[in-house]
Structure formats: C-alpha cells, structure tokens
Amino acid sequence: MNKKTLYDYDFAGKTVFCRVDFNVPMKDGKITDETRIQAALPTIKYLSEQGARVLLASHLGRPKGEVVESLRLAPVATRLSELLGKEVQAVQEAHGPVAKQAVEGLEDGGVLLLENVRFYPGEEKNDPELAKAFASLADIFVNDAFGAAHRAHASTEGIAHYLPSAAGFLMEKELDVLGKALSNPERPFTAVIGGAKVKDKIGVIDNLLDKVDNLIIGGGLAYTFVKAQGYEVGKSLLEEDKLDLAKQFMEKAEQKGVKFYMPEDVIVADDFSDDANKKEVAISGIPADWEALDIGPKTRKTYEAVLKASKLVIWNGPMGVFELESFAGGTKAVANALAEASDTYSVIGGGDSAAAVEQFGLADKMSHISTGGGASLEFMEGKELPGVVALSEK
C-alpha cells in the first residue's frame, strides 16, 4: 500500500481527527455487537500513547441529516471508556462551538467522541464546507473506517483534501489482506459467492473469474444459474432477467479454465419457515411448489473438499437461509471446512458471512474477517474506494 500510515507521522501534541466505524447494532440504548469498536482499538490506543489528542468521528444508522436522539453516540463512549480504561467524553456536536471547546480542553493522550456525523446534511453530500469544518478541529486526519471507505462523504473523503492524512491500522490491514488476495494470491484460489441476489454480486463474480481457480456458488443467487442450465427451480429465488448473464458467466469460467461449482442437491421446503416440511432432493428434482433454501449434503461434501484443498479462500455470502436453524447446515459446513483447513488462508468478506461465522462461534478460526460488507464487496469488484484514494501518498 503506497498510502501514508500511522508510522509516517509524529503525533505528540497533535490533534487527530480519526474517522472510525462505530456503526454498531443497538437495542434499547445498549450495544448488541461491539466487533467494530474492538477493531478500532489498536489505532485509538496507538494515537493516545503517542500523545495525540484523539477526536473520534463516526456515523451510526441513517439519521438522514437530522438529529435522531436514539442514534446519538453516547452509549459508544461509555463502552469505549471501559475498553480503554480511561474516560472518553461524548460531545453532542461533530463541529461547532461546543465541539471546539471540548477539543481545546483535551489533554495530550486524551480521547473525545464527536457526535454522529450523519446528523449533518452535508456529510453524505460530501459538502466541502462541512469537510473544512471537520478539518478545522485537527492537525492530521486518520481514516480507520474501512467499512465506510466506499463512500465519498465529508468525514471519509472530503476532509482528506484539507489535512495531511494516513490510513489507520485497521484500514491498512484490510487493504493489505484484500489487496494481496486479489493481486498476488496463493493457489489454488477459491471464491465462495452466496447470498440472495445475482444482481448484488455481478461485479464480484465478473472480476473474480479473472483471478480464481475455483468458483463456488450457493445461496439464493445459485438458482438463477441452476435455471440457466435448464433445470426447474420451483418457487426458489429466481432472477429471470439475469439468466443470460448467468450463462455468460458459466461460459467465461470455461474459457478461463475456472472450475465452476454449483449445487448438485438441495434442501427444499414447502414454506419459508423453520417448521416447514423439508426434504433433500437432487438439483434435477425440485418440486414445482417447493423452494430450495439450502445446499444439500452431497454439495456440502464437494464444497468442503475444494475448500480444504485451497490455499486461499474468499467467502462472500451464505449458502442458504442460515438465520433459520433448519436451513443453516450448508453455511455451517462451509464455515466448518474453513475452520478446520489449517493450510488455507480464509478471508470472510463482511456482512452476512461474518455474521454467520460469528453465530456459529467460529470467528476466531478464520484468518481475516473484513469489517466492511459493502466496502469489501466493491474492493473485490476491482473498484477504487474514495476514502482510500483521498489519503496522502507516501
């Protein structure tokens, strides 16, 4: 990575505007999953230990440019204080007189959490005036919010035009891991692409077909490929307008010498619920009024063998409706195979796949779990991320 990192600056006595991703799930004012807060700790601790005055900025939810009381960041400051072992003050502004006063009262090594940046209408519009207002609070900008790096917003991209900047440790790690995987992968290199819709994964499949040795398909999007091969899919998810594209992808795989794996058997149900009637059928035998909600046992065995023989695996999207216990088996099989494969470097592309390995208690067995669903997806599509492009070059 040719962007400046934390080691390129002397932070002693400097005020740092550090963009983090504290967009955490909350219930009744309590944080239900603090993975993203934990992920930002190394950068926050380093800046504080180096004697910087640390201003943390993040979004939370979608307040659409106005103040929403339930989306204030105060509960995050409380939890952060416990994790850092020192008081983190929450300010009810992200810029302005109150924020300025709080910044001026901060000691070297002190940490301050600014208010939700999306309370300001200019944030998502990348308004230069708002970006300048953020920049006026600090000497250096650090972006550690990989989860928001694909957004060109005032606190992720705009501010970088007005301050010297650097990637934080988390941002650096994400870019290194994903960058290495896509530019210089260990082989065999396998991509596992699941999830509901083909349309969400078009760019990823297209880009990865130029790079991988094996492509494994699962989840709802698989049935458009199954149908494209001439099988009936009953009431399974199907995108009629993507059938030609599915055929093109399968042809491209053949031309590129990529092995293309699709379900050979599935678990079908007569209703989308945990207590529906369900049965295992071959891919050629999906009944007209039933829908496929998971990959079957034969498919799982095939996929497991491919994964265990791979040196690098990128996984994005579940194999079935893992939120329902009855249809979690396929996703669990992939997660278990990666957990057991000691010679395989596994990269979990955020979002649902990350939630699944977390749910199965296998998160610590994965080599790298990306903190950015949308950002890692766009990176895997080969797109440049605005929040990264804007950072200072070495």
From Swiss-Prot:
InterPro entries: Phosphoglycerate_kinase, Phosphoglycerate_kinase_CS, Phosphoglycerate_kinase_N, Phosphoglycerate_kinase_sf
Protein name: Phosphoglycerate kinase
PANTHER family listed in its UniProt record: PHOSPHOGLYCERATE KINASE, PHOSPHOGLYCERATE KINASE 1, CHLOROPLASTIC-RELATED
Cellular compartments annotated: Cytoplasm
Residues with PTM Phosphoserine: S183
Pfam family, one: PGK
Species, as recorded: Shouchella clausii (strain KSM-K16) (Alkalihalobacillus clausii)
Residues involved in substrate binding: D21, F22, N23, R36, H59, L60, G61, R62, R118, R151
Family in the record: Belongs to the phosphoglycerate kinase family.
